[in-house]
Amino acid sequence: MAVKSGARSGRNVVHLARPTLRETLGRLAPGTPLRDGLERILRGRTGALIVLGYDDSVEAICDGGFVLDVRYAPTRLRELSKMDGAVVLSSDGSRILRANVQLVPDPSIPTDESGTRHRSAERTAIQTGYPVISVSHSMSIVTVYVAGERHVVPDSATILSRANQTIATLERYKGRLDEVSRQLSTAEIEDFVTLRDVMTVVQRLEMVRRISLEIDADVVELGTDGRQLKLQLDELVGDNETARELIVRDYHANPDPPTAAQVAATLEELDSLSDSELLDFTVLARVFGYPSTAEAQDSAMSSRGYRAMAAIPRLQFAHVDLLVRSFGSLQNLLAASADDLQSVDGIGSMWARHIREGLSLLAESTIADRLA
């Protein structure tokens, strides 16, 4: 594990590869031993200060208390938290190492907290890099400090209420995505695609991705209470990430099919767009390498065929890539015979017939859907 340490403005701040907020919330989720201990503390109307990790940086700010080094148990955490000092757990949370400790972090580390316990928690988290939990006995609130972030841990009912509203929004987004994706598929078969058609699908794919991340964070925080929510999320999102990759492969402005690195860079740039930029098709066009003008939105496009052939059962990506690089576009693939397909190195007669039948069925079903 890479370790970098340094001091800034007189502050002894240690930068280590430490747990993220997401990882920490997973450890605090309902159904986990740590959450059980926190619930017992809340029910007992006592406060607590808990450090989730131990090394020399934690040892350096510990004053007093006593060494335990015993197996973690929710009941033990509850009893030890009755004392005024902090409880220090091992990095994996399996053992209670110290109790009734006075934490003395660097007072020059800035904090917006007002209470003594919360100020110590935030400064300790910043200085050591380990997550620190503060339980307020007066307000019955659990706050976790990690990676420079402050997060109040809500109860499951609050998270579920919020997540159910977000799921309803995701359902609307997914319905619209399915609609514009079908329209694009029809336009591809009829060779009547515009840049606006493509950017509409790109926008909707990204909107689904972003809202699904919000729900996924709730799933992590819910723990065992989020199983049903997780099933709903997985069903709605489906293969959204694959669809994002395929549309980049089909429509990136690069003259040749984009490399894996180019696809990854394009998706990363899409991820970095602000919500307002995501609503602007000219910005999306620029990400794909096209002119960022309103006039360019009516430009004719031609699919390379990655999306279409992904719908053919059992067809491997390696075969799809070979065919796209050989024929250049979906229209050329649709016009190719089984013999033409077989002429590509790596495509045998059986695969050629399978692909030819798959493309024919795809064209027929797409046109039938439009007429229905």
UniProtKB/Swiss-Prot annotation:
Q: Does the keyword Oxidoreductase apply?
A: no
- Origin species, per record, is Mycolicibacterium smegmatis (strain ATCC 700084 / mc(2)155)
Q: Which cofactor does it need?
A: Mg(2+)
This protein is called DNA integrity scanning protein DisA
Q: Name one GO biological process term.
A: DNA repair
Give this protein's Gene Ontology molecular function annotations: adenylate cyclase activity; ATP binding; diadenylate cyclase activity; DNA binding
UniProt-reported outcome of changing residue 137 to A = Loss of enzymatic activity
Annotated Pfam families: DAC, DisA-linker, HHH_2
- Assigned keywords, A-Z: ATP-binding, DNA damage, DNA repair, DNA-binding, Magnesium, Manganese, Nucleotide-binding, Nucleotidyltransferase, Transferase
Q: Which gene encodes it?
A: disA
Keyword hit for Lyase: no
Task: Identify its protein family.
Answer: Belongs to the DisA family.
Which residues belong to any copy of the DAC domain? 18-156
The record's subunit annotation is: Homooctamer. Interacts with RadA; this interaction leads to the inhibition of the diadenylate cyclase activity of DisA.
Q: Where does ATP bind?
A: 85, 103, 116-120
Function as written in the Swiss-Prot or TrEMBL entry: Participates in a DNA-damage check-point. DisA forms globular foci that rapidly scan along the chromosomes searching for lesions.
- List the EC numbers from the record: 2.7.7.85
Summarize induction of expression: Forms part of an operon with radA.
